[in-house]
């Protein structure tokens, strides 16, 4: 039986387009509004990443850091993220949910308990930013036991030899970091160069899916039409912050924005 992630990519392949993956910090704007944001994003997205808040999100740039700070100060915790995912997955047409965050949260929750809860609420995948290969292998194995895809991160400086080891041990989906920067950084590398690196990594195992993230915006997304998928994060978080500051409804604004961005990769 194919996983929810595999079925999502299968649908994209039939439509001859990359998967659109959206990211936002769970609980931003409050639990109710956050669920509404997730529902709105998932109408256009093929997979949905949800960040779980952390006080020192070292891989994230200013836009996403603002969201982490906002959710933490409003009292949102990991249990609230699980509640949001559980409610969202009651919809039979729900998209695969990938949780993204930092290992300390998982460590304090306890690995086995955390994965059990993920499985219970219907999480399809996990990205743990500060748990690199090969140290992440025992945890990745636990994820697989719980039918949860552990996404390995591959950076621009990862050698082909190391990339081969990572891909060989990985699950069905991996994440290529586009450049040496935090999330939301301005692309310092031409999309052409990013794609050259992407194609080298993709050739290692063409069957496994590889998506591109970090620095993807409305101006650059079209360049990655031939990849397996693109991740939009900081662009979305920036719009949430702008909407909340102007006391506008982020749900309405995000729906329009993501719909327009998706048209660029069709």
Language model: regions and residue ranges:
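N-terminal amphipathic alpha-helix/helix-capping segment at the start of soluble metabolic enzymes
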Residues: 1-21, 84-90
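Short beta-strand/loop segments at the ligand-binding rim of alpha/beta enzyme cores
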Residues: 15-21, 92-102, 143-153, 201-215
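Glycine-rich beta-to-alpha transition loops that act as phosphate-gripper elements at the mouths
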Residues: 25, 30, 100-108, 132-133, ...
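Catalytic cores of alpha/beta
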Residues: 31-42, 158-169, 204-205, 212-230
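Glycine-rich phosphate-binding active-site loops on the catalytic face of alpha/beta enzymes
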Residues: 47-57, 125-135, 175-185, 226-246
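Catalytic beta/alpha-barrel core
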Residues: 73-75, 122-135, 149-158, 163, ...
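Glycine/Thr-rich beta-alpha phosphate-binding loop at enzyme active sites
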Residues: 163-201, 239-244
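Alpha/beta catalytic cores of nucleotide-metabolism and tRNA/nucleoside-modifying enzymes
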Residues: 200-208, 219-222, 227, 231-266
């Amino acid at each position: 039986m194919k996983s929810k992630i595999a079925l999502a990519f299968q649908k994209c392949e039939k439509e001859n387009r990359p998967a659109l993956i959206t990211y936002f910090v769970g609980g931003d704007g409050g639990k109710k509004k956050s669920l509404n944001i997730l529902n709105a994003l998932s109408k256009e997205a093929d997979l949905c990443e949800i960040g779980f808040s952390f006080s020192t999100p070292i891989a994230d740039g200013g836009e996403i850091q603002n969201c982490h700070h906002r959710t933490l100060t409003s009292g949102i915790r990991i249990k609230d993220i699980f509640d949001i995912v559980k409610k969202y997955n009651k919809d039979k047409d729900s998209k695969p949910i990938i949780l993204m965050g930092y290992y300390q949260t998982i460590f304090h929750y306890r690995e086995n308990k955390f994965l059990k809860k993920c499985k219970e609420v219907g999480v399809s995948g996990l990205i743990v930013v500060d748990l690199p290969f090969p140290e992440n292998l025992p945890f990745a194995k636990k994820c697989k036991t719980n039918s949860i895809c552990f996404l390995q991160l591959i950076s621009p400086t990862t050698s082909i030899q190391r990339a081969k080891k990572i891909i060989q041990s990985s699950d069905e989906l991996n994440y290529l970091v586009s450049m040496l920067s935090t999330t939301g950084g301005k692309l310092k590398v031409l999309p052409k160069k990013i794609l050259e690196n992407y194609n080298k990594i993709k050739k290692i195992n063409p069957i496994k899916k590889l998506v591109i993230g970090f620095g993807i915006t409305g101006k650059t997304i079209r360049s990655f039409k031939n990849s397996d998928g693109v991740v939009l994060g900081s662009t979305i978080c920036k719009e949430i912050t702008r909407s909340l500051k102007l006391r506008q409804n982020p749900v309405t604004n995000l729906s329009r924005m993501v719909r327009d961005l998706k048209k660029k990769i069709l």
